[in-house]
Design a protein with these regions (language model features):
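Acidic/histidine-rich alpha-helical segments that form the ligand environment
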Residues: 86-121, 130-139, 143
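Short, contiguous alpha-helical
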Residues: 2-9, 17-36, 40-85, 122-162
Length: 162
């Protein structure tokens, strides 16, 4: 990815939720920027023995958004599987759109809940967790996968950046 795609880390003064969502959005956008300009074959290219690929990472993050924000925070039913294998019948654009839609809904849930101390609607391993924990976890999870994506992208075409 060209140097022009690098973005500055959010620098804002706001309340806790605004700041956390800004950092999470930054990581979400970083994942999608890493995928820009690649062919379908490149997005599905497996660069490590575990089978991880760029499109699979984005698909996994769709499930993560659903699992944490839609299911645990908001109480929705969940039937995902965290599978990183995207069927060939599913296009890269469909996966990207699903990710944007999932995080858009997640942000709506966060705004509606509005309190970092509010507990999840559904327990995680028999414990209801505060929204603050879920946000912190998702920032870390998304950033970790953004790092994986950076390495895969560099292997594909030498591009680096965030």
């Amino acid at each position: 990815m060209p140097e022009t795609q690098r973005r500055e880390v959010p620098r804002l003064v706001g309340d806790e939720l605004t700041t956390a969502v800004s950092f999470l959005d930054f990581q979400r956008e970083a994942i999608l920027r890493t995928c820009e300009g690649l062919t379908d074959d490149q997005l599905r290219w497996v660069g490590v023995p575990t089978g991880t690929n760029l499109l699979g990472l984005v698909s996994h993050l769709v499930d993560s958004e659903f699992w944490w924000f839609h299911h645990h925070v908001d109480g929705d039913a969940w039937d995902g599987d965290f599978d990183m294998n995207v069927p060939s019948s599913v296009t890269a654009d469909e996966v990207r759109q699903a990710y944007r839609a999932a995080w858009g809904r997640s942000n709506e849930i966060i705004r509606r809940v509005g309190d970092p101390d509010a507990l999840t609607a559904l327990p995680v391993r028999e414990q209801r967790l505060p929204l603050r924990w879920v946000l912190s976890h998702m920032i870390a999870e998304t950033a970790r996968h953004a790092g994986h994506a950076d390495i895969l992208r560099e292997q594909i075409d030498g591009a680096t950046g965030r």
